[in-house]
Structure formats: C-alpha cells, structure tokens
Amino acid sequence: MKETDVLKKLEIDEYYYGDFGKKYLSNSDISTLLTNPLALGQPQKPIPAFLVGGYFHTAILEPEKLNKFKIVESTTRNTKAYKEISGGELCLLQHEVDKIELMTEKVLNNNVCRDLIRGINIEYERPGITELEGLNWKGKADIINHDEKLIIDLKTTADLNKFKWSASKYNYDLSLIHISEPTRPY
C-alpha cells in the first residue's frame, strides 16, 4: 500500500486505533517497551486521567465528536448510581466534564491560544508514519499551524506543579520525536 493511502486510512479513528493501526508502534507503546515489553500489543486498561485528557482533546479538536463520551451524574466512580449506569465501562463524571468545558473555554478565549489553534492555515489530527531503527511508527499531530510553523501537542495535567514528572512518566519527550518526524511539515 502506498504511503499516501496508508495516511488517508489512518485519518479515520477506527483504522488508526484498530487492527490496521496496530501494525505501527505509537506513543502508548513506548511506556510498555520501557517498563514491560512482554505486554506489548496487549490492550491497556483505561484510566480516568486518559479519559479526561481525551475529552479535552476532543473538545478542542473535534467538538462534533463529544457525544461519543458517556457521562454520569455522580460524585465518584464508587457510587451505586455510577456502577449501575456505567455497566462496568469507564465513564466521565459530570463534574469532570464541567471542569474540561471551563478549561476549553479558557483556552479558546485566550487570544494567543485561539489564534494558534483556530488560525487560518491549520490542520488537526494529522497522522504520519515513519521508520525508526527498523520499526514502523505512527504519530498524530494534534494541531499543525502552518503559518507559525508549529506542531502543537495538547496535554492535560491534574497538578501543574507535577507536570514535569508526568511528562517524564508518560514519555512526552519521546512522543514528540515520533509525532514530529512523521508529520513534520517543514
């Protein structure tokens, strides 16, 4: 398959995150390779922080897809109501959604952020592929601002003072390598 055809296919979430996309390593595989290589390729258990981050990503980049998230009006994930409504699925809590909506509003009401994110010559969720050290990698640039020649990778954190440790824990530095290489527009 030609690279252009692969990239076109990877633009579709079902392919990017499904069997087709699993032919390529991605940032989620980096931690597994570093901490438990035998678990490579096994599904990862979803965690609330990643669900919250995913909702923020979607709110900024693809707000038309927010309805795919299941939201439960509950104070915690331990309540009887949450367990009944969620059916064992990891769901967002309403107060988490409220917080993310406020964050999204703050980001988009900031002139600098809004212009970088919603400018004229912008691409969202642009996939790329590359070979590094004989391995095939995929990456997806959240935002490419061609006018400013920027690749923007959105991140969330529960505690800004601990962000540098989160960046290390989740290998954000390494994710930037495989995001920027395959999607480098310049």
Report residues per predicted region:
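Metal-dependent nuclease catalytic cores that hydrolyze phosphodiester bonds in DNA/RNA
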Residues: 1-139
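Conserved catalytic cores of phosphodiester-cleaving nucleases, focusing on short active-site segments
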Residues: 139-165
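Gly/Ser/Thr-rich active-site loops/lids in small-molecule metabolic enzymes
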Residues: 168-176
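Single conserved hydrophobic/aromatic residue that forms the stacking wall/gate
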Residues: 177-178, 182-186
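Generic preference for flexible, low-structure residues
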Residues: 72, 167-168
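Short, local alpha-helical segments
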Residues: 40-42, 162-167
